[in-house]
């Protein structure tokens, strides 16, 4: 009998009526096989809980904050199970811990360390629809953890991999993956399918998907459908082998999508004596402070000195500066610059690795749009530019036009 893992986001569960609608969709799916449903917190519940915590403390204890935030998904979990039972279905709700999700002890951004699906399998064998709280797990010391914002997607894909499900279906307030953010680019087009490699790059650089969920799907080969919970539309299928299935239209430009991400900040450490170990001396303390560094550029200066520039999330800028100011002294400089109000804009496509001219085409389009490029980074299938945040919408539109992404495949 087929097994499907579904995930429903907070916007799909924001009211009792929406929860009833989701329950009806889950119940209909069970007529064709077994169903496990992963749920996010209702609507803006997580933000409300964060606001409650901030009313108690400016810096809430991470362990206790995880205990608090995990209750949002538990509410949804219980309510969806109640709604299913009201429809006459057999259903059971499980917390992340009850579902066997074991994590590291990094509160607020824990990683899945293991998953024992025995309890879920027992409930499925009893004929139950299993509703699992997303976003959470438990450590070996039995402490509740959360996996980071948006990680209910990861919970769903991890469960699908562990249960060897036929596929994972992620239902949200959008009807699939688009060639760009439709809020920025009105001409953006929904993709019928996309490969894991391209989707991972898009998600990592701003597309509305949890990058770790895509990575999990790629490693364990779990097909992922992204579709609307409000409309009966086909959505976008993310799966292995989609990357190179180029149609005539795709061969025309080989760029599959534009990703954008706001709230980026830049830090530059100037005039560092160029010697072995300076990069490690700077970035190891940042890693120890649990600060993620993205783009790194090293520029050779004069008289044996170098400038190191890197980007972080704007929310991490102040903490980063605390670390960098201390390290800079050890590196023999007191010249540290910072810039906020930046954004990333990227073009992504597996076909770019085999064809020249994409960088120049991108840079020309941005130049013609009056957009200054502050930093550049690339992978085999992606080119990313750092631009001013208030120009990111224009950047996305001119690139979408330059690569003719509005045209059907």
Residue spans for each PLM region:
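Nucleotide/pyrophosphate-binding catalytic subdomain
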Residues: 1-214, 218, 311, 387-388, ...
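Glycine-rich beta-alpha junction loops
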Residues: 42, 174-176, 220-224, 228-233, ...
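Phosphate/diphosphate-binding glycine-rich loops and adjacent basic-rich segments that engage nucleotide
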Residues: 133, 202-263
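Short hydrophobic alpha-helical runs that function as membrane-insertion/retention elements
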Residues: 167-171, 224-226, 294, 375
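N-terminal short leaders/motifs
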Residues: 168, 214, 221-223, 323-326
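A conserved regulatory-domain signal marking ACT and ACT-like small-molecule sensing domains
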Residues: 237-409
